[in-house]
Amino acid sequence: MNRNEAITALVNYALEKELIEQEEKVWAVNRILEVMQADSFSWEESAKGKEAGLTEILDTLIDDAYERCVLEENSVVYRDLFDTKLMGSLTPRPVQVMKKFQQLQEESSQRATDWYYQFSQDTNYIRKDRVAKDIRWKTETEYGEIDISINQSKPEKDPKAIAAARNQPASDYPRCMLCEENVGYAGRLNYPARQNHRIVPVTINNTDWYLQYSPYVYYNEHCICFNKVHTPMKIDKACFAKLLDFVRQFPHYFVGSNADLPIVGGSILAHDHFQGGHYTFAMERAPIETEISFEGYEDVKAGIVKWPMSVIRLNAKEPERLIDLADKILGSWRGYTDEAAMILAETDGEPHNTITPIARRRGEDFELDLVLRNNLTTPDHPLGIYHPHEEFHHIKKENIGLIEVMGLAILPGRLKKELEAVEEKLLSGENMTEDPLTKSHAKWAADIAANYEITAENVKEIVQKETGIVFSKVLEQAGVYKRTPEGKEAFLRFINQV
Protein backbone atom coordinates (compact mmCIF):
# COMPACT_ATOMS: atom_id res chain seq x y z
CA MET A 1 0.00 0.00 0.00
CA ASN A 2 1.31 3.45 -0.83
CA ARG A 3 0.44 6.62 1.10
CA ASN A 4 -2.54 7.57 -1.07
CA GLU A 5 -4.01 4.07 -0.81
CA ALA A 6 -3.57 4.10 2.98
CA ILE A 7 -5.20 7.55 3.35
CA THR A 8 -8.09 6.39 1.14
CA ALA A 9 -8.44 3.22 3.23
CA LEU A 10 -8.40 5.21 6.50
CA VAL A 11 -11.13 7.58 5.28
CA ASN A 12 -13.22 4.59 4.12
CA TYR A 13 -12.68 2.99 7.55
CA ALA A 14 -13.89 6.18 9.29
CA LEU A 15 -16.97 6.21 7.04
CA GLU A 16 -17.73 2.54 7.68
CA LYS A 17 -17.41 3.01 11.48
CA GLU A 18 -19.54 6.20 11.31
CA LEU A 19 -16.78 8.37 12.74
CA ILE A 20 -17.40 10.78 9.84
CA GLU A 21 -20.26 11.46 7.38
CA GLN A 22 -20.12 11.05 3.59
CA GLU A 23 -20.04 14.86 3.22
CA GLU A 24 -16.88 15.03 5.38
CA LYS A 25 -14.63 12.91 3.16
CA VAL A 26 -12.63 15.80 1.71
CA TRP A 27 -12.29 17.42 5.14
CA ALA A 28 -11.08 14.07 6.56
CA VAL A 29 -8.44 13.70 3.83
CA ASN A 30 -7.16 17.19 4.58
CA ARG A 31 -7.01 16.49 8.33
CA ILE A 32 -4.89 13.40 7.64
CA LEU A 33 -2.63 15.28 5.18
CA GLU A 34 -2.03 17.92 7.86
CA VAL A 35 -0.87 15.28 10.36
CA MET A 36 1.23 13.57 7.66
CA GLN A 37 2.73 16.94 6.61
CA ALA A 38 1.99 15.95 3.01
CA ASP A 39 0.62 18.34 0.40
CA SER A 40 -0.49 16.11 -2.45
CA PHE A 41 -3.16 13.43 -2.66
CA SER A 42 -5.24 11.49 -5.13
CA TRP A 43 -8.06 9.13 -4.15
CA GLU A 44 -6.77 5.58 -4.75
CA GLU A 45 -8.98 2.59 -4.01
CA SER A 46 -6.97 -0.63 -4.02
CA ALA A 47 -7.58 -4.28 -3.24
CA LYS A 48 -4.86 -4.06 -0.56
CA GLY A 49 -6.49 -1.02 1.01
CA LYS A 50 -9.90 -2.71 1.07
CA GLU A 51 -8.53 -5.83 2.74
CA ALA A 52 -6.28 -4.05 5.24
CA GLY A 53 -7.22 -3.82 8.91
CA LEU A 54 -6.82 -0.58 10.85
CA THR A 55 -3.41 -1.55 12.30
CA GLU A 56 -1.97 -2.20 8.83
CA ILE A 57 -3.35 1.08 7.48
CA LEU A 58 -1.89 3.08 10.38
CA ASP A 59 1.45 1.25 10.18
CA THR A 60 1.71 2.15 6.47
CA LEU A 61 1.14 5.84 7.26
CA ILE A 62 3.56 5.84 10.21
CA ASP A 63 6.27 4.15 8.11
CA ASP A 64 5.76 6.78 5.39
CA ALA A 65 6.03 9.60 7.95
CA TYR A 66 9.24 8.11 9.37
CA GLU A 67 10.81 7.67 5.91
CA ARG A 68 10.14 11.36 5.20
CA CYS A 69 11.55 12.39 8.64
CA VAL A 70 8.14 13.67 9.77
CA LEU A 71 8.43 11.16 12.60
CA GLU A 72 11.63 11.64 14.59
CA GLU A 73 12.08 8.05 15.84
CA ASN A 74 10.57 4.74 14.77
CA SER A 75 9.98 3.39 18.28
CA VAL A 76 6.67 2.37 19.87
CA VAL A 77 6.37 5.57 21.95
CA TYR A 78 6.75 7.86 18.91
CA ARG A 79 4.56 5.62 16.74
CA ASP A 80 1.79 5.62 19.37
CA LEU A 81 1.85 9.41 19.65
CA PHE A 82 1.63 9.67 15.86
CA ASP A 83 -1.14 7.15 15.15
CA THR A 84 -3.25 8.59 18.00
CA LYS A 85 -2.92 12.00 16.36
CA LEU A 86 -4.10 10.45 13.07
CA MET A 87 -7.13 8.82 14.72
CA GLY A 88 -7.84 11.95 16.74
CA SER A 89 -8.21 13.89 13.51
CA LEU A 90 -11.17 11.62 12.61
CA THR A 91 -12.77 11.19 16.06
CA PRO A 92 -16.10 13.02 16.57
CA ARG A 93 -16.11 16.03 18.89
CA PRO A 94 -16.71 15.31 22.62
CA VAL A 95 -20.21 16.83 22.68
CA GLN A 96 -21.33 14.71 19.71
CA VAL A 97 -20.26 11.57 21.59
CA MET A 98 -21.97 12.68 24.81
CA LYS A 99 -25.23 13.47 22.99
CA LYS A 100 -25.24 10.11 21.20
CA PHE A 101 -24.65 8.24 24.49
CA GLN A 102 -27.42 10.17 26.29
CA GLN A 103 -29.83 9.63 23.40
CA LEU A 104 -29.21 5.84 23.49
CA GLN A 105 -29.39 5.82 27.29
CA GLU A 106 -32.98 7.03 27.07
CA GLU A 107 -33.76 3.77 25.23
CA SER A 108 -31.66 1.56 27.55
CA SER A 109 -28.40 1.79 29.45
CA GLN A 110 -27.15 -1.39 27.78
CA ARG A 111 -27.69 0.03 24.28
CA ALA A 112 -25.71 3.10 25.33
CA THR A 113 -22.76 1.11 26.73
CA ASP A 114 -22.80 -1.35 23.78
CA TRP A 115 -22.43 1.57 21.37
CA TYR A 116 -19.84 3.42 23.48
CA TYR A 117 -17.66 0.32 23.95
CA GLN A 118 -17.66 -0.36 20.19
CA PHE A 119 -16.93 3.33 19.51
CA SER A 120 -13.92 3.22 21.89
CA GLN A 121 -12.52 0.33 19.85
CA ASP A 122 -13.33 1.90 16.47
CA THR A 123 -11.33 5.04 17.35
CA ASN A 124 -8.38 2.81 18.33
CA TYR A 125 -8.49 4.21 21.88
CA ILE A 126 -8.83 0.55 22.86
CA ARG A 127 -6.12 -1.07 20.74
CA LYS A 128 -7.77 -4.39 19.96
CA ASP A 129 -4.65 -5.75 18.25
CA ARG A 130 -2.64 -5.25 21.47
CA VAL A 131 -5.32 -6.51 23.82
CA ALA A 132 -5.46 -9.69 21.71
CA LYS A 133 -1.78 -10.30 22.59
CA ASP A 134 -2.58 -10.73 26.29
CA ILE A 135 -2.15 -14.37 27.33
CA ARG A 136 -5.22 -15.66 29.18
CA TRP A 137 -6.33 -18.94 30.69
CA LYS A 138 -8.50 -20.32 33.49
CA THR A 139 -7.35 -22.46 36.41
CA GLU A 140 -9.60 -24.69 38.48
CA THR A 141 -9.07 -24.12 42.23
CA GLU A 142 -11.00 -24.97 45.39
CA TYR A 143 -12.66 -21.55 44.96
CA GLY A 144 -13.87 -22.28 41.44
CA GLU A 145 -12.37 -21.34 38.10
CA ILE A 146 -10.16 -18.26 38.39
CA ASP A 147 -8.86 -16.12 35.50
CA ILE A 148 -5.16 -15.68 34.82
CA SER A 149 -3.71 -13.15 32.37
CA ILE A 150 -0.20 -12.12 31.43
CA ASN A 151 -0.34 -8.53 30.33
CA GLN A 152 1.13 -7.87 26.87
CA SER A 153 -0.98 -4.86 25.86
CA LYS A 154 1.03 -2.19 27.70
CA PRO A 155 3.99 -1.57 25.37
CA GLU A 156 7.51 -1.70 26.79
CA LYS A 157 9.20 1.71 26.55
CA ASP A 158 12.38 1.79 24.52
CA PRO A 159 15.62 3.25 25.98
CA LYS A 160 15.78 6.17 23.50
CA ALA A 161 12.27 7.37 24.41
CA ILE A 162 13.03 7.01 28.14
CA ALA A 163 16.22 9.07 27.71
CA ALA A 164 14.42 11.73 25.66
CA ALA A 165 11.58 11.90 28.21
CA ARG A 166 14.11 12.73 30.95
CA ASN A 167 15.01 15.90 29.10
CA GLN A 168 11.41 17.08 28.86
CA PRO A 169 10.30 19.87 31.21
CA ALA A 170 8.21 18.68 34.16
CA SER A 171 4.46 19.10 33.67
CA ASP A 172 1.48 18.89 36.00
CA TYR A 173 -1.01 18.83 33.12
CA PRO A 174 -3.13 16.73 32.90
CA ARG A 175 -3.27 16.43 36.70
CA CYS A 176 -3.53 12.64 36.46
CA MET A 177 -4.33 9.84 33.99
CA LEU A 178 -8.05 10.04 34.81
CA CYS A 179 -8.81 13.78 34.79
CA GLU A 180 -11.08 15.14 32.05
CA GLU A 181 -8.08 17.19 30.83
CA ASN A 182 -6.96 14.00 29.03
CA VAL A 183 -9.73 14.32 26.43
CA GLY A 184 -8.01 15.36 23.20
CA TYR A 185 -4.59 15.76 24.86
CA ALA A 186 -1.67 15.41 22.42
CA GLY A 187 0.53 13.49 24.84
CA ARG A 188 4.31 13.66 25.19
CA LEU A 189 7.18 11.19 25.43
CA ASN A 190 6.34 10.35 29.05
CA TYR A 191 2.54 10.65 28.79
CA PRO A 192 0.14 8.88 26.40
CA ALA A 193 -1.62 10.76 23.61
CA ARG A 194 -5.39 10.96 24.03
CA GLN A 195 -6.69 12.80 20.94
CA ASN A 196 -9.05 9.88 20.25
CA HIS A 197 -10.27 9.68 23.88
CA ARG A 198 -13.89 10.60 24.66
CA ILE A 199 -15.71 10.43 28.00
CA VAL A 200 -19.43 10.58 28.82
CA PRO A 201 -21.03 12.28 31.85
CA VAL A 202 -23.01 10.27 34.41
CA THR A 203 -24.71 11.45 37.59
CA ILE A 204 -24.13 9.14 40.53
CA ASN A 205 -25.78 9.80 43.87
CA ASN A 206 -26.39 13.42 42.75
CA THR A 207 -22.72 14.08 41.96
CA ASP A 208 -21.04 14.65 38.58
CA TRP A 209 -18.91 11.76 37.33
CA TYR A 210 -17.62 10.54 33.96
CA LEU A 211 -17.57 7.13 32.34
CA GLN A 212 -14.85 5.81 30.04
CA TYR A 213 -13.34 2.44 29.11
CA SER A 214 -9.90 1.24 30.11
CA PRO A 215 -7.60 1.19 27.07
CA TYR A 216 -6.13 -2.07 28.42
CA VAL A 217 -9.44 -3.98 28.76
CA TYR A 218 -8.48 -6.55 31.39
CA TYR A 219 -11.96 -8.11 30.98
CA ASN A 220 -15.10 -7.54 28.87
CA GLU A 221 -16.27 -3.89 28.79
CA HIS A 222 -13.76 -2.88 31.47
CA CYS A 223 -14.98 0.60 32.35
CA ILE A 224 -13.72 3.32 34.67
CA CYS A 225 -16.12 5.71 36.35
CA PHE A 226 -14.37 8.75 37.82
CA ASN A 227 -15.28 11.84 39.78
CA LYS A 228 -15.40 15.06 37.74
CA VAL A 229 -13.33 16.64 40.54
CA HIS A 230 -9.75 15.50 41.18
CA THR A 231 -10.34 14.33 44.75
CA PRO A 232 -8.72 11.42 46.65
CA MET A 233 -10.16 7.90 46.89
CA LYS A 234 -12.35 7.49 49.95
CA ILE A 235 -14.29 4.46 51.15
CA ASP A 236 -17.26 5.79 53.14
CA LYS A 237 -21.06 5.73 53.24
CA ALA A 238 -21.27 7.99 50.16
CA CYS A 239 -19.01 5.56 48.27
CA PHE A 240 -21.43 2.67 48.95
CA ALA A 241 -24.35 4.87 47.85
CA LYS A 242 -22.56 5.75 44.59
CA LEU A 243 -21.70 2.12 43.80
CA LEU A 244 -25.31 1.02 44.31
CA ASP A 245 -26.68 3.98 42.36
CA PHE A 246 -24.36 3.03 39.48
CA VAL A 247 -25.73 -0.56 39.31
CA ARG A 248 -29.26 0.84 39.58
CA GLN A 249 -28.61 2.82 36.37
CA PHE A 250 -26.43 0.16 34.69
CA PRO A 251 -27.88 -3.14 35.99
CA HIS A 252 -25.90 -5.19 33.45
CA TYR A 253 -22.58 -3.98 34.93
CA PHE A 254 -20.85 -4.68 38.23
CA VAL A 255 -18.84 -1.85 39.80
CA GLY A 256 -16.26 -1.76 42.57
CA SER A 257 -13.76 0.53 44.22
CA ASN A 258 -10.17 -0.05 45.13
CA ALA A 259 -9.40 0.40 48.81
CA ASP A 260 -8.30 3.86 49.94
CA LEU A 261 -4.98 2.94 51.62
CA PRO A 262 -1.54 2.24 50.12
CA ILE A 263 -0.45 -1.41 49.54
CA VAL A 264 -4.06 -2.68 49.51
CA GLY A 265 -5.32 0.10 47.19
CA GLY A 266 -4.92 0.61 43.46
CA SER A 267 -2.28 2.56 41.53
CA ILE A 268 -4.27 5.82 41.47
CA LEU A 269 -5.27 6.89 45.00
CA ALA A 270 -5.32 10.63 44.20
CA HIS A 271 -8.46 10.60 42.00
CA ASP A 272 -11.70 9.04 43.21
CA HIS A 273 -12.79 6.38 40.73
CA PHE A 274 -14.48 3.00 40.35
CA GLN A 275 -13.96 0.14 37.91
CA GLY A 276 -16.75 -1.93 36.46
CA GLY A 277 -17.81 -3.89 33.43
CA HIS A 278 -19.84 -6.66 31.87
CA TYR A 279 -18.10 -9.72 33.25
CA THR A 280 -18.78 -12.45 35.80
CA PHE A 281 -15.75 -12.94 38.04
CA ALA A 282 -15.06 -16.09 40.04
CA MET A 283 -15.85 -14.21 43.26
CA GLU A 284 -19.37 -13.43 42.04
CA ARG A 285 -19.90 -17.15 41.34
CA ALA A 286 -18.50 -18.15 44.76
CA PRO A 287 -21.23 -19.31 47.17
CA ILE A 288 -21.98 -18.22 50.73
CA GLU A 289 -20.06 -20.52 53.06
CA THR A 290 -21.49 -19.36 56.40
CA GLU A 291 -24.75 -17.46 56.79
CA ILE A 292 -24.65 -14.61 59.30
CA SER A 293 -27.03 -11.87 60.40
CA PHE A 294 -26.67 -8.39 61.83
CA GLU A 295 -28.94 -7.13 64.58
CA GLY A 296 -31.49 -4.65 63.26
CA TYR A 297 -30.80 -5.79 59.68
CA GLU A 298 -32.55 -9.15 59.70
CA ASP A 299 -34.09 -8.27 56.29
CA VAL A 300 -30.59 -8.19 54.74
CA LYS A 301 -29.24 -11.57 53.64
CA ALA A 302 -25.63 -11.80 54.81
CA GLY A 303 -22.87 -14.36 54.73
CA ILE A 304 -19.16 -15.14 54.54
CA VAL A 305 -18.19 -16.00 50.96
CA LYS A 306 -16.18 -19.13 50.12
CA TRP A 307 -13.21 -17.17 48.82
CA PRO A 308 -9.46 -16.95 49.59
CA MET A 309 -9.89 -13.38 50.86
CA SER A 310 -12.18 -12.31 53.72
CA VAL A 311 -15.50 -11.30 52.15
CA ILE A 312 -18.86 -10.39 53.70
CA ARG A 313 -21.71 -10.52 51.16
CA LEU A 314 -24.86 -8.44 51.72
CA ASN A 315 -28.02 -8.78 49.62
CA ALA A 316 -31.30 -6.83 49.85
CA LYS A 317 -34.21 -5.51 47.79
CA GLU A 318 -33.57 -1.92 48.92
CA PRO A 319 -30.13 -0.35 48.37
CA GLU A 320 -30.63 1.99 51.38
CA ARG A 321 -30.50 -0.99 53.77
CA LEU A 322 -27.20 -2.15 52.25
CA ILE A 323 -25.72 1.36 52.45
CA ASP A 324 -26.56 1.68 56.16
CA LEU A 325 -25.30 -1.79 57.09
CA ALA A 326 -22.13 -1.50 54.97
CA ASP A 327 -21.37 1.82 56.67
CA LYS A 328 -21.84 0.21 60.08
CA ILE A 329 -19.48 -2.67 59.16
CA LEU A 330 -16.91 -0.23 57.73
CA GLY A 331 -17.00 1.97 60.85
CA SER A 332 -16.54 -1.08 63.05
CA TRP A 333 -13.70 -2.48 60.91
CA ARG A 334 -11.81 0.85 60.74
CA GLY A 335 -11.43 0.84 64.53
CA TYR A 336 -11.10 -2.92 65.07
CA THR A 337 -8.02 -4.50 66.66
CA ASP A 338 -7.52 -8.20 67.38
CA GLU A 339 -3.87 -8.77 68.26
CA ALA A 340 -4.33 -12.54 68.45
CA ALA A 341 -5.36 -12.48 64.77
CA MET A 342 -2.60 -9.96 63.86
CA ILE A 343 -5.10 -7.19 63.06
CA LEU A 344 -4.20 -3.71 64.28
CA ALA A 345 -6.47 -0.77 63.46
CA GLU A 346 -3.55 1.66 63.63
CA THR A 347 0.10 2.03 64.63
CA ASP A 348 1.62 5.42 65.48
CA GLY A 349 -1.57 7.12 64.29
CA GLU A 350 -1.44 5.47 60.85
CA PRO A 351 -4.71 3.66 59.99
CA HIS A 352 -4.51 0.11 58.60
CA ASN A 353 -8.07 -1.21 58.15
CA THR A 354 -10.22 -0.52 55.10
CA ILE A 355 -12.54 -2.28 52.67
CA THR A 356 -12.60 -3.09 48.94
CA PRO A 357 -16.34 -2.91 48.05
CA ILE A 358 -18.00 -4.43 44.95
CA ALA A 359 -21.63 -3.84 43.93
CA ARG A 360 -23.82 -5.78 41.49
CA ARG A 361 -27.41 -6.75 40.80
CA ARG A 362 -28.51 -10.29 41.58
CA GLY A 363 -31.77 -10.48 39.64
CA GLU A 364 -33.84 -7.58 41.01
CA ASP A 365 -31.86 -7.49 44.27
CA PHE A 366 -28.87 -5.31 45.11
CA GLU A 367 -25.71 -7.01 46.32
CA LEU A 368 -22.57 -5.68 47.99
CA ASP A 369 -19.39 -7.65 48.65
CA LEU A 370 -17.20 -6.12 51.37
CA VAL A 371 -13.61 -7.41 51.25
CA LEU A 372 -11.80 -6.69 54.53
CA ARG A 373 -8.29 -5.27 53.98
CA ASN A 374 -5.35 -4.37 56.22
CA ASN A 375 -2.03 -2.82 55.13
CA LEU A 376 0.09 -3.54 58.22
CA THR A 377 3.81 -4.11 57.54
CA THR A 378 6.43 -5.86 59.69
CA PRO A 379 10.22 -6.31 59.40
CA ASP A 380 9.54 -9.83 58.04
CA HIS A 381 6.96 -8.52 55.56
CA PRO A 382 8.02 -4.94 54.68
CA LEU A 383 5.60 -4.84 51.71
CA GLY A 384 2.65 -5.92 53.86
CA ILE A 385 1.53 -8.94 55.87
CA TYR A 386 -1.64 -9.23 53.76
CA HIS A 387 0.19 -8.91 50.45
CA PRO A 388 1.98 -11.47 48.22
CA HIS A 389 4.82 -12.95 50.31
CA GLU A 390 8.36 -13.20 48.98
CA GLU A 391 8.09 -16.92 48.17
CA PHE A 392 5.62 -16.02 45.39
CA HIS A 393 7.28 -12.82 44.10
CA HIS A 394 8.65 -14.78 41.13
CA ILE A 395 5.02 -14.82 39.87
CA LYS A 396 3.38 -11.83 41.60
CA LYS A 397 4.76 -9.11 43.86
CA GLU A 398 2.55 -6.16 42.92
CA ASN A 399 -0.43 -4.94 44.99
CA ILE A 400 -3.62 -7.01 45.01
CA GLY A 401 -6.15 -4.50 43.70
CA LEU A 402 -9.86 -4.68 42.97
CA ILE A 403 -9.64 -6.79 39.79
CA GLU A 404 -7.41 -9.39 41.42
CA VAL A 405 -9.50 -9.47 44.59
CA MET A 406 -12.38 -10.67 42.37
CA GLY A 407 -10.30 -13.50 40.89
CA LEU A 408 -8.51 -12.20 37.79
CA ALA A 409 -4.70 -12.22 37.99
CA ILE A 410 -2.97 -9.47 36.03
CA LEU A 411 0.55 -10.86 35.90
CA PRO A 412 3.59 -8.92 34.64
CA GLY A 413 4.58 -9.16 30.97
CA ARG A 414 8.03 -10.58 31.88
CA LEU A 415 6.35 -13.93 32.67
CA LYS A 416 5.68 -14.71 29.00
CA LYS A 417 9.37 -15.33 28.26
CA GLU A 418 10.17 -16.62 31.74
CA LEU A 419 7.46 -19.30 31.78
CA GLU A 420 8.34 -20.36 28.22
CA ALA A 421 11.94 -20.82 29.41
CA VAL A 422 10.72 -22.80 32.46
CA GLU A 423 8.73 -25.09 30.12
CA GLU A 424 11.79 -25.68 27.91
CA LYS A 425 14.00 -26.55 30.89
CA LEU A 426 11.38 -28.81 32.47
CA LEU A 427 11.48 -30.81 29.23
CA SER A 428 15.27 -30.80 28.83
CA GLY A 429 16.08 -31.22 32.54
CA GLU A 430 18.57 -28.32 32.35
CA ASN A 431 19.63 -26.42 35.47
CA MET A 432 17.32 -23.43 36.05
CA THR A 433 19.54 -21.51 38.48
CA GLU A 434 22.07 -20.49 35.81
CA ASP A 435 19.61 -18.81 33.43
CA PRO A 436 18.42 -15.32 34.49
CA LEU A 437 15.03 -16.07 32.88
CA THR A 438 14.40 -19.10 35.09
CA LYS A 439 16.54 -18.45 38.18
CA SER A 440 13.71 -16.96 40.29
CA HIS A 441 11.41 -19.88 39.35
CA ALA A 442 13.93 -22.69 40.09
CA LYS A 443 12.53 -23.93 43.42
CA TRP A 444 8.92 -23.77 42.19
CA ALA A 445 9.85 -25.57 38.94
CA ALA A 446 11.67 -28.32 40.88
CA ASP A 447 8.45 -28.99 42.82
CA ILE A 448 6.53 -29.16 39.53
CA ALA A 449 9.07 -31.63 38.10
CA ALA A 450 8.76 -33.83 41.20
CA ASN A 451 4.95 -33.91 41.08
CA TYR A 452 4.21 -34.49 37.38
CA GLU A 453 5.14 -36.77 34.51
CA ILE A 454 6.07 -34.00 32.10
CA THR A 455 5.83 -34.36 28.31
CA ALA A 456 6.00 -31.93 25.39
CA GLU A 457 2.21 -32.26 25.10
CA ASN A 458 1.33 -31.36 28.71
CA VAL A 459 4.12 -29.02 29.89
CA LYS A 460 2.36 -25.75 29.01
CA GLU A 461 -0.91 -26.83 30.62
CA ILE A 462 0.91 -27.91 33.81
CA VAL A 463 2.91 -24.66 34.12
CA GLN A 464 -0.25 -22.61 33.54
CA LYS A 465 -2.19 -24.64 36.11
CA GLU A 466 0.57 -24.25 38.73
CA THR A 467 0.80 -20.50 37.99
CA GLY A 468 -2.94 -20.25 38.69
CA ILE A 469 -2.52 -22.16 41.95
CA VAL A 470 0.22 -19.72 43.03
CA PHE A 471 -2.21 -16.86 42.37
CA SER A 472 -4.90 -18.49 44.53
CA LYS A 473 -2.30 -18.80 47.33
CA VAL A 474 -1.36 -15.15 46.88
CA LEU A 475 -5.05 -14.24 47.37
CA GLU A 476 -5.07 -16.34 50.56
CA GLN A 477 -2.07 -14.34 51.79
CA ALA A 478 -3.96 -11.11 51.03
CA GLY A 479 -6.91 -12.36 53.10
CA VAL A 480 -6.93 -10.90 56.63
CA TYR A 481 -8.55 -14.03 58.09
CA LYS A 482 -6.89 -17.30 57.14
CA ARG A 483 -8.96 -20.24 55.95
CA THR A 484 -8.30 -22.30 59.09
CA PRO A 485 -10.53 -23.04 62.12
CA GLU A 486 -8.64 -20.28 64.02
CA GLY A 487 -9.09 -17.84 61.12
CA LYS A 488 -12.81 -18.59 60.88
CA GLU A 489 -13.20 -18.11 64.64
CA ALA A 490 -11.41 -14.73 64.46
CA PHE A 491 -13.59 -13.66 61.48
CA LEU A 492 -16.75 -14.48 63.47
CA ARG A 493 -15.35 -12.56 66.49
CA PHE A 494 -15.27 -9.44 64.31
CA ILE A 495 -18.75 -10.06 62.85
CA ASN A 496 -20.32 -10.70 66.26
CA GLN A 497 -19.05 -7.42 67.70
CA VAL A 498 -20.36 -5.30 64.78
Language model feature labels by segment:
Residues 238, 247-270, 276-330, 334-337:
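Catalytic or ion-translocation cores adjacent to nucleophile or general acid/base/metal-coordination motifs
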Residues 196-198, 230-255:
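Helical scaffold of the NTase/Pol beta-like nucleotidyltransferase catalytic core
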Residues 1-225, 229-232, 306-308, 322-326, ...:
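Active-site microenvironments that recognize anionic phosphate/pyrophosphate groups
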